[in-house]
Every structure is written in structure tokens, then in C-alpha cells.
């Protein structure tokens, strides 16, 4: 097996571990007073409702395109597409959960501890989404390439 196929999933796992580390550091930050927590809970509820509705709409598109790929190309590319869509949804979910937590903590840090602390929390929140996308992307492409060692098949992952 090629060295890159061994190292790449490890790098993906490290990216996800970094994302989880950053997410846990955001969780530890002070979310502020009761009113701030209440507003943050409304924002989180709205964000999760949005994602749920968006994912329901995307599910129909993913299902149709999955069938089209099976018929038009091959089942391996269709599976790659499905894995890509799933990993994309996971990254979006992680990103949204952390972003809603980071927002209130950033606002509170700006009020109580200053701009440097607030920017640190805000950038940490953004890095969770970025590292989730990178980690899941590298892991997904690596595993699919190990299973289907044809770059044309793995391109379905990117479509997802």
C-alpha cells in the first residue's frame, strides 16, 4: 500500500481531533448572563431547525442523483457521492453547533475580557468548521481510494 494512503487518513483524524479540541475549548468559555444564554438558545434552536429543513430538502436531491449516478456511471461513483454528501452534512452540523455556541461566548468575551479573547473564541469557532471539512474530506477520499483505486470513481465524493 502506498505511504500516502496510510498517512492521509491519519492526518484527517488529527484534523478532526484538533476540531474537537477547539470545540471543547469553546464550550469552556463563559456564555454570559442568563439573558445572553436565553438568546443563544433561541439562535441555536433556529439554526438547528434551518439545518433540519435544509437536510430534508437535500435528501431528495441526493437520492435522485444517487440513482442517476448508478444508472449513468456506476454504483461505485454513486457510493462515493453518497459518502461525500454524508460527510458534508456532518461537517455542516458540527460547524453550525459550534458556531452557535461560539457566538454568545464571543460576545461575552468582548464585553468582559476584551477584543483579543473574543477574537480567539471567534477564530476557534471558525477553525472547527474548517478542520471538520478538511478532516472528513481527507478521510473520505482516502478510504474511498483504498476501496476503489480509480480517481474517476472517487470524484463522486467531491460531488457529494
Predicted features along the sequence, with ranges:
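Hydrophobic, small-residue-rich transmembrane alpha-helices and their short perimembrane loops
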Residues: 1-160
Amino acid at each position: 500500500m502506498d505511504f500516502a494512503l496510510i498517512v492521509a487518513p491519519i492526518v484527517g483524524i488529527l484534523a478532526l481531533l484538533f476540531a474537537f479540541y477547539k470545540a471543547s475549548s469553546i464550550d469552556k468559555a463563559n456564555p454570559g448572563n442568563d439573558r445572553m444564554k436565553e438568546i443563544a438558545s433561541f439562535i441555536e434552536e433556529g439554526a438547528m431547525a434551518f439545518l433540519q429543513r435544509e437536510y430534508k430538502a437535500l435528501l431528495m436531491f441526493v437520492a435522485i442523483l444517487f440513482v442517476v449516478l448508478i444508472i449513468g456511471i456506476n454504483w461505485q461513483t454513486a457510493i462515493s457521492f453518497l459518502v461525500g454528501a454524508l460527510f458534508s452534512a456532518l461537517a455542516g452540523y458540527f460547524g453550525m453547533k459550534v458556531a452557535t455556541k461560539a457566538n454568545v461566548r464571543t460576545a461575552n468575551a468582548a464585553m468582559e475580557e476584551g477584543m483579543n479573547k473574543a477574537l480567539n473564541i471567534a477564530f476557534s469557532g471558525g477553525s472547527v468548521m474548517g478542520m471538520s471539512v478538511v478532516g472528513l474530506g481527507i478521510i473520505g477520499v482516502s478510504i474511498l481510494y483504498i476501496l476503489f483505486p480509480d480517481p474517476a470513481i472517487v470524484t463522486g465524493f467531491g460531488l457529494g
